[in-house]
């Protein structure tokens, strides 16, 4: 049974020192598409975190009964089932957001973070540790999404969660929104800037020059 220190390390590590986007450069595609608003970034964070944590848990529970030759198929079946449940819940209780997220919730099935943690961690680790690892990686992914979404919505539209924060010139205010920040390429540059800042602050994350 894992002790509290190990569980904390597995949970906090992917958020701070081993972030799946900032360090491993995984899950970037969806991060470009869903971060124009804080609302969609938050819902995507919750969706991926739930799928990653629960898929890790279920895969770990049956890991000793999965034949090696079909393990990827079993993993994808579990992940796909969870994604379908999450998608149906979103359509039932947050239909407008589900429409905005479009295919990106469905694409969680093939998300590198979810598949990677299932194969590299859940197949070799007890259930509780696997659950915490999935939770940590989902939150690490979400931390980047919410950071990028904050900048894009605030300075691209002058609002957060649809609530006006910076009074726009078109409404008699002082702020001229930067429409470029609402385009997907802006997220690419913001994520790049975040990675640069993190690696300046944590030089040990810089890849060795070969």
From Swiss-Prot:
It comes from the Bacteria. One of its GO terms (molecular function) is oxidoreductase activity, acting on NAD(P)H, quinone or similar compound as acceptor. GO terms for cellular component: plasma membrane. Its EC number is 7.2.1.1. NCBIfam families: nqrD, PRK09292.1, PRK12405.1. Composed of six subunits; NqrA, NqrB, NqrC, NqrD, NqrE and NqrF. Belongs to the NqrDE/RnfAE family. PANTHER family: ELECTRON TRANSPORT COMPLEX PROTEIN RNFE, NA(+)-TRANSLOCATING NADH-QUINONE REDUCTASE SUBUNIT D. This is Na(+)-translocating NADH-quinone reductase subunit D. The gene is nqrD.
């Amino acid at each position: 049974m894992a002790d509290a220190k190990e569980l904390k390390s597995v949970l906090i590590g992917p958020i701070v020192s081993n972030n799946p986007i900032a360090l491993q450069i995984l899950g970037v595609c969806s991060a470009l598409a869903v971060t124009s608003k804080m609302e969609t970034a938050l819902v995507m964070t919750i969706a991926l975190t739930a799928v990653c944590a629960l898929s890790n848990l279920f895969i770990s529970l049956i890991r000793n009964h999965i034949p090696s030759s079909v393990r990827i198929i079993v993993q994808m079946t579990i992940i796909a089932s969870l994604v379908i449940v999450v998608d149906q819940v979103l359509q039932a209780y947050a239909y407008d957001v589900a429409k905005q997220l479009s295919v990106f919730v469905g694409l969680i099935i093939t998300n590198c973070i979810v598949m990677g943690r299932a194969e590299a961690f859940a197949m070799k680790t007890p259930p509780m540790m696997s659950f915490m690892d999935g939770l940590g990686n989902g939150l690490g992914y979400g931390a980047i999404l919410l950071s990028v979404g904050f900048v894009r919505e605030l300075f691209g539209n002058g609002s957060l969660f649809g609530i006006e924060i910076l009074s726009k010139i078109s409404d008699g205010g002082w702020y001229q929104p930067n429409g470029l920040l609402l385009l997907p390429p802006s997220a690419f540059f913001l994520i790049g800037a975040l990675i640069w800042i993190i690696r300046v602050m944590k030089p040990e994350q810089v890849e060795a020059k070969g």
